[in-house]
């Protein structure tokens, strides 16, 4: 099997590298996916922060508060480097339970505070520091769009015990985290083409906002990713 590890050694990020902090609700799939992009560019550092005390959006919010803004904070947003913080979440029952809206409000407050910080750096243009990348029903819809241009057919999905099992069944051999993330550009195009929001402006079924995070990553790794695809 031809993999990224075989053809491309990790590059060490420079001191001033742009950092993308990704707080995700999964401990396996999401970290495995984003690990692919670590070291693909010396100008980008991908930092995945898995859940520690639960995966619901409020627990992830508390985790970010402690990691970035607590007394013993571990990470720091560098506005001059345009660092960003992303929450990668599933819709699950969180929407119904009202746990996603507070997370989006949290990001809005961080972005408002960031506007004040930008004033310290006249050369830094305002940008969206904190972002939510919600997938409906789950992160697996993002994996699905690496291979398919059209939305899933509801009847086909319903014939499987779960959406995750459906995606595993339609991708031959299942999603390979050592090579399939190289299809990032296709995933962005396909998910954007099929992106729909509901009446509450949240991603509708089979829609994902992860393409926005994908676009940010692609901006740094595109050239090396193209070379990697050609070798794979």
Predicted regions and their residues:
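C-terminal accessory helical subdomains adjacent to catalytic cores in phosphodiester-
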Residues: 1-21, 29-52, 70-232
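Phosphate-binding/switch region of NTP-binding enzymes
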Residues: 25
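Eukaryotic endosomal/vacuolar membrane-trafficking regulators centered on PX-domain-mediated PI3P pathways
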Residues: 56-66
């Amino acid at each position: 099997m031809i993999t990224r590890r075989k053809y491309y050694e990790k590059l060490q990020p420079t001191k001033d590298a742009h950092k993308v902090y990704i707080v995700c609700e999964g401990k396996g799939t999401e970290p495995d996916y984003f690990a692919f992009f670590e070291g693909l560019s010396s100008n980008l550092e991908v930092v995945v922060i898995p859940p520690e005390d639960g995966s619901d959006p409020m627990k992830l919010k508390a985790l970010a508060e402690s990691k970035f803004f607590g007394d013993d904070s571990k990470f720091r947003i560098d506005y001059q480097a345009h660092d960003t913080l992303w929450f990668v979440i599933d819709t699950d029952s969180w929407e119904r339970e009202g746990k996603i809206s507070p997370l989006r409000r949290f990001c809005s407050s961080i972005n408002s505070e960031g506007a004040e910080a930008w004033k310290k750096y006249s050369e830094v243009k305002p940008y969206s520091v904190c972002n939510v990348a919600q997938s409906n029903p789950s992160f697996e819809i993002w994996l699905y769009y690496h291979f398919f241009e059209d939305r899933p057919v509801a009847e086909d999905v319903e014939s499987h015990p779960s959406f995750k099992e459906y995606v595993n069944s339609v991708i031959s051999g299942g999603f390979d985290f050592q090579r399939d993330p190289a299809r990032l550009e296709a995933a962005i195009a396909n998910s954007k083409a099929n992106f729909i929001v509901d009446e509450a402006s949240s991603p509708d079924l089979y829609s994902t906002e992860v393409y926005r995070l994908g676009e940010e990553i692609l901006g740094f790794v595109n050239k090396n990713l193209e070379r990697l695809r050609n070798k794979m």
